[in-house]
């Protein structure tokens, strides 16, 4: 199980954060689970009006994240799924998406929750999608990570008393 050793994050007083979720459209059953998990996590954190945007595929996530980071969002969550095929396309997409999202976060100071599944099989993706029978909920985890990081950034930018 890849989730072994995951931290238990405690996130409080974040209901005022502006959070955007960007989700790709490939592999709709997996994506529906990821989006549902992300929205559920936001609701549990008291963030009831997130922005939800859809993009064609995972490769489009970084450019939309970059624009949103410049529009006052406190955290962004990128959701997608890339499943290995018989060509190097998988490697190029995974590397481009990962590098692009990290670059957005580092350059803008806005945390980007990484909820992009990079799997060898559809079964692996379904097992991480947060749907019935899944062992993990990566949409929920990506939100928690992004919001927890935004809360940390907010705490270090506030004046010390």
Swiss-Prot record:
Single Gene Ontology BP annotation: riboflavin biosynthetic process
Similarity section: Belongs to the DMRL synthase family.
Active site: 89 (proton donor)
Residues where (2S)-2-hydroxy-3-oxobutyl phosphate binds: 86-87, 128
Record field: catalytic activity: (2S)-2-hydroxy-3-oxobutyl phosphate + 5-amino-6-(D-ribitylamino)uracil = 6,7-dimethyl-8-(1-D-ribityl)lumazine + phosphate + 2 H2O + H(+)
Taxonomic source organism: Streptomyces coelicolor (strain ATCC BAA-471 / A3(2) / M145)
Biochemical pathway: Cofactor biosynthesis; riboflavin biosynthesis; riboflavin from 2-hydroxy-3-oxobutyl phosphate and 5-amino-6-(D-ribitylamino)uracil: step 1/2
Gene: ribH
SUPFAM superfamilies: Lumazine synthase (SSF52121)
Name of the protein in its database record: 6,7-dimethyl-8-ribityllumazine synthase
PANTHER family linked to this entry: 6,7-DIMETHYL-8-RIBITYLLUMAZINE SYNTHASE, 6,7-DIMETHYL-8-RIBITYLLUMAZINE SYNTHASE DMRL SYNTHASE LUMAZINE SYNTHASE
Keyword check for Transferase: yes
Annotated GO MF terms: 6,7-dimethyl-8-ribityllumazine synthase activity
């Amino acid at each position: 199980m890849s989730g072994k050793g995951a931290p238990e994050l405690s996130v409080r007083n974040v209901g005022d954060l502006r959070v955007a979720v960007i989700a790709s459209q490939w592999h709709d059953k997996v994506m529906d689970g990821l989006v549902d998990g992300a929205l559920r996590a936001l609701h549990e954190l008291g963030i009831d009006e997130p922005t939800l945007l859809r993009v064609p595929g995972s490769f489009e996530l970084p450019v939309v994240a970059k624009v949103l980071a410049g529009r006052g969002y406190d955290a962004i969550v990128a959701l997608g799924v890339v499943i290995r095929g018989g060509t190097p396309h998988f490697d190029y997409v995974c590397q481009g998406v990962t590098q692009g999202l990290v670059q957005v976060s580092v350059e803008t100071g806005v945390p980007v929750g990484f909820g992009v599944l990079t799997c060898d099989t559809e079964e692996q993706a379904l097992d991480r999608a947060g749907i019935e029978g899944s062992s993990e909920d990566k949409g929920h985890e990506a939100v928690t990570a992004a919001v927890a990081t935004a809360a940390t950034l907010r705490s270090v930018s506030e004046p010390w008393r």
